[in-house]
Amino acid sequence: MSSTMSFDNLAKVLAVLVAEQGSYTYVDKLGYVPSKDLAVFYLKEALRDLHSIQQKEKFENEKARELVGKIDYERVEKELEDIAKTDERKELREKTSLIAAKALALSAKLGGGSGE
């Protein structure tokens, strides 16, 4: 796994979605994704949903709103590119599992999720 890539920003994206939507859907999808193309697709969907939430006038979870302000979208783009360049399935699994685990840890701090 790339030692310079932390995937913190993608984890923040997913954590905000867990906190705001009360659903682990994207974390679960990413944790079991079989290919890099599908991983990028799921992350694109997550980013689209995050953008939609950002358009709302009020976040339901104030901590999630604060975390959105800490997302570095240039880093998000680099993290996505790193995943898209991953050729080995084992390495992809390591990266997506790391993102999912970090997202769960962050969402716990935000008080999100419904226990699905």
Curated annotation (Swiss-Prot):
Phylogenetic classification of the source organism: Archaea, Methanobacteriati, Methanobacteriota, Archaeoglobi, Archaeoglobales
Protein name: Uncharacterized protein AF_1870
Organism domain of life: Archaea
